[in-house]
Amino acid sequence: LKKYFLPGVALLALAAPAWAQGPVSGTISDARTGEPLPGATILLDGAALGATSPAGTYSLASVPAGPHELRITFVGYEPLVRPLQGQPQAQRLDERLQPGGVLTGEALIVGTRASDRTATVYTDLGKQALGKRNFGQDLPYLLDQTPSAVASSDAGAGVGYTNLRIRGVDGTGINTTINGVPLNDPESHGSFLVNLPDLASSINSIQVQRGVGTSQNGSAAFGASLNISTLENRREAYAETQNSYGSFNTWKNNVSFGTGLVGKYFTFDGRLSRIASDGYMNRASSDLKSYYFAAGYQRGSTLLKFITFSGREKTYQAWNGVPEPAITGNQAQLQVYLDNGELTADQAARALTEGRRWSYYTYPNQTDNYQQNHYQLHLSQGLGSDWSLGAALHLTRGFGYYESYRANRRFSAYNLPDVVVGADTLTRTNLIDRKWLDNYFYGGTFALNYQPRANDKLQATLGGGWNKFDNEHYGEIIWAQYASTSFPGQRYYYNLAHKTDYNAYARATYQALPWLGLYADAQVRHIRYAIDGVEDAQQDVTTRASYTFFNPKAGATISLGHGQQLYGSFAVGQREPVRTDFTDRQPGYAPARAERLNDLEAGYRYSRADLAFLGPSTAVRLSANYFDMTYVNQLVNTGQLNDVGTALRTNVANSYRRGVELTGYVAAADKISLSSTLTLSRNRILDYRDVTYDASYNPVVAAEGRNTAISYSPSVVSAHTLEGQPLGGLRLALLYKTVSRQYLDNTENVNRSLADYQVLDLRVRYALHPGFVKELELAVLVSNLLNARYSANGYTYSYLGASGNSETFNWYYPQATRNFLASVNVRF
């Protein structure tokens, strides 16, 4: 444990000599009448921090050192935006709002966001916090320093296919919404952020909720929620460009612009981006393009906004990973892979020369090609002084394929007859196929918000959504050495899936006493799912399933005074199996069942900005959260993958994730700051049934009733960021991440695991204001500064091998050794 904890203590010691930040408070009032405005929303760097009191007052206990953006919004008034400089001394800022404005983007997402009144655990990240880390890597790497988060990359350097786990739960258990619209694929529940490259450059805030959290649209949260907002309204014209280059020939170029307010009522914003990389893994290249465009109309208490964004990705397939002997150099072990047909002779030879950067494929166009176009129409409408409505219509169009060279494949696997040549019969051929997805996802969401001006004791939301997903799955043969009866473009399998999902929820917070707040939330969700047709192995995957879930939540907050708060909540989350749980069920495993999560969260928050033990106005912000996530029929990863790299899963009757999350943030004026998180957890299956296979691939139950660790669930995760400003405009940061051992399957076998690892990054940013532009920023990110050699993901499987003994085959995803990204950013 000390290897994870002591580095944080050491960083605290470095920060201790100069530890301070200051509070900001004031009163918000009507510019015409001077009357206070209770319930006005206060946002700092895009993150909602609370609302004004019945007297119109607000207080931010501790504003970190450095420049910030303070934003104040209220239904029926123009939003107010002003710069704010964090400093050790207390500041008072009284502001007056002009009538006629509208609660802008916040009204559209407030229905799914948590606050300090919802008794849940969450982390808010504003545009500035995201921008510090945004060098072109995918979103999981920008969230890697948040509590309980673990990021990994198939290609090794954060570009292309990436993965995020929170509390050991992968992307299929993390509900992701953009402006309240579901992003998770309805069939797989995954959020494939590779399809939206450089999305971070258009995000103005993210809220990361851990546990079940508040009710969300889309698939249920089984470990966390990512609530993303791109709804920033900038009233002044702007333009900026970000350009990065670094290791593995990695490039990022983007241009962003905004017109500001045009003709009193209209705004237009846009972005064009391109990210490209050769990847750390050999041939694991990425070519990613995206755009973002928003057109807004606001007048009085009405905001109408159309948003479209799109991404197109072409990535060389790296989802097979690297065989263990390629990393260890163990030739005897490599021979086992060769003897059992896991590797060809050529692949085994390359494993010895390429090592940990080995790639399974050599066919030049072994690529994944996909485009995803999003269209959203949002309405925010003030309904008198106490009510507001946020509503959205959405359409997502996705289509693409991955292309593969297949050696020595049977004609029968493609539903083709054998080829007769004279007296010979050919049963196999080399060929190239493409597996396609072609889909539409469409629907609507709404949130009716009640926040009385005269009394902020009660806040309530009634919301919901209806969504439909239509998805075609099919394969095409585009070339064959021996064509049989096929022709270019011939389909060899086809199935059509339909999924309908609708939900409704009601949520309220009530300040029963000055020190006691109550929270309640209830959601009803119904799903209908149907598949018709055959899959690539020519098996019939016809499926019919429907589910209805009731998910209640309740909690309470207790104010202890002096910046202290206790909170506790209990929430139920339920969700349906994903597509592969139906179509790829392994022999020996029962049909997949729906999962249930009972989530208990309890914690303590402490925030003071008026202490003096480290100097005047010393500020301290600490929190401790206990979680007990108890599952019934949890679907856990078996450690195996299907042929497109998707993890295979099985139900386990009883399991749990329990632990504590400790977080802290301290700062000293504008000179030095430290954020630190530590998660200690125990993740167990109480009655695991281990299935292996004999030489004929018949299932054999190896063990039953075992108490084992849940796969991919580290017991210790920590993250620490020490940042300082030794000179004006120059900011240096050290980022340290530790992750303990993770097991690749549920047998808790150390020979099927990922070793613990520790990674140190260095970030340097230098901002200039030369006069001919608003800002010129030079930045460098050195990742894995100490050149650690580690793998952050992997998979495993076992069977009775050619030797007659059980053989285990481990595959890993090595992460890049020391590498860098340098950027030049210009703001006009």
What are these regions (language model features)?
Residues Y4, G729, T738-Y743, Y766-F828:
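C-terminal beta-signal and adjacent terminal beta-strands/loops
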Residues S59-S62, P182-R210, S229:
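Short acidic/polar hinge/loop motifs at secondary-structure boundaries
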Residues P140-P182, N204:
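Extracytoplasmic beta-strand/coil segments of soluble accessory domains associated
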Residues N369-N408, S412-D536, S559-G561, L566-S569, ...:
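Face-selective signature of the C-terminal outer-membrane beta-barrel domain
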Residues P514, P616-T630, T650-N746, N825:
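Gram-negative outer-membrane beta-barrel transporters
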